[in-house]
Swiss-Prot record:
Pathways involved: Carbohydrate degradation; glycolysis; pyruvate from D-glyceraldehyde 3-phosphate: step 1/5
GO molecular function: glyceraldehyde-3-phosphate dehydrogenase (NAD+) (phosphorylating) activity; NAD binding; NADP binding
This protein's UniProt keywords: Cytoplasm, Glycolysis, NAD, Oxidoreductase
Annotated catalytic residues: 151
Gene: gpd
Record protein name field: Glyceraldehyde-3-phosphate dehydrogenase
Species in which this protein is naturally found: Lentinula edodes
Catalytic activity field: D-glyceraldehyde 3-phosphate + phosphate + NAD(+) = (2R)-3-phospho-glyceroyl phosphate + NADH + H(+)
First-tier enzyme category under EC: oxidoreductase
Annotated GO biological process: glucose metabolic process; glycolytic process
Membrane-spanning residues: none
Length: 337
């Protein structure tokens, strides 16, 4: 049995969510909606990817549908989310990956077309945010619109949870060195709300804001107000890294901290939080399915209560995997799977 899924928005996350969904037998993507991409171009965009490589299966069109590995996927081109005929193909769970409909009010438009649940693949100002491995125990089936938070929150929260549960976080600051995303500019251009954000991503390190650290306070309430952060956008295509500096309540050696993270990576956070002692760099994590991979050899400690921890994440592939995981979890809790 598989839950029938629709994807709204066939951009970076939409396409990689589909690649991830095809690997999960509990997910059946039956439709994609994107008013800005013609069907033939969808085939091309799904087949070729500058970061994750060529799709290893078959992709073609037939009868106005997208055919992936012989599987038919209906294609719609509606700009109005409320006009997408999800019910015509039986799609009940919708991945909202346009980056446009990120509030409950806007994302709820999908319900008009027959959807039962919407998973926003971005942070939301008002929808409940869930991070796999961190706060799924607070899931409430009554909410028709939920958020998978951000890729950075998905990296930071599991690590912060381990440290907070084991040693207690008094306060912390986070920096994410973040790969390029689609909203950035290839050459300098106007950006009235974010002047630095209007500068060319090519050849620049760009300081930026991020709500990822504060969002951890929403998924781990006991950390609310104890954590904030910022971002540096850098000219790499994929894979980002979190630098978490925290002061702990309990004294601990760096080896004790490493041991706690390693234990969690093999136990309750297996598949979510990874652990490595190898001397790695960013490209080593392209295609890594973990939300967060703790780099044990990159961190440093000033004293037994003050430490800098490093965690990598494929901000495209790893995050998209969690979108699919959250969708499956919700479907099971809702009794749809």
């Amino acid at each position: 049995m598989a839950v029938k899924v629709g994807i709204n928005g066939f951009g970076r996350i939409g396409r990689i969510v589909l690649r991830n969904a095809l690997l999960n037998p509990e997910v059946n993507v039956v439709a994609v909606n994107d008013p800005f991409i013609a069907l033939e171009y969808m085939v091309y965009m799904f087949k070729y990817d500058s970061v994750h490589g060529r799709f290893k299966g078959t992709v073609e069109t037939k009868g106005g549908k997208l055919i992936v590995d012989g599987k038919e996927i209906s294609v719609f081109g509606e700009k109005d989310a409320g006009a997408i005929p999800w019910s015509s193909v039986g799609a009940e769970y919708i991945v909202e990956s346009t980056g446009v409909f990120t509030t409950i009010e806007k994302a709820s438009a999908h319900l008009k077309g027959g959807a039962k649940k919407v998973i926003i693949s971005a942070p939301s100002a008002d929808a409940p945010m869930y991070v796999c491995g961190v706060n799924l125990d607070s899931y409430d089936s009554q909410h028709a619109v939920i958020s998978n938070a951000s890729c950075t929150t998905n990296c930071l929260a599991p690590l912060a949870k381990v440290i907070h549960d084991k040693f207690g976080i008094v306060e912390a600051l986070m920096t994410t060195v973040h790969a390029t995303t689609a909203t950035q500019k290839t050459v300098d251009g106007p950006s009235n709300k974010d002047w630095r954000g209007g500068r060319s991503v090519n050849g620049n390190i760009i300081p930026s804001s991020t709500g990822a650290a504060k969002a951890v306070g929403k998924v781990i309430p006991s950390l609310n107000g104890k954590l904030t952060g910022l971002a540096f956008r850098v000219p790499t295509l994929d894979v980002s890294v979190v630098d978490l500096v925290c002061r702990t309540e309990k004294s601990a050696t760096y080896d004790e901290i490493k041991a706690a993270v390693k234990e969690a990576s093999k136990g309750p956070l297996k598949g979510i939080l990874g652990y490595t002692e190898d001397h790695v760099v960013s490209t080593d994590f392209i295609g890594d399915n973990h939300s967060s991979i703790f780099d044990a050899t990159a961190g440093i400690q000033l004293n037994k209560n003050f430490v800098k921890l490093i965690a990598w994440y494929d901000n495209e592939w790893g995050y998209s995997g969690r979108v699919v995981d959250l969708l499956v979890f919700a479907a099971k809790k809702d009794g749809a799977l």
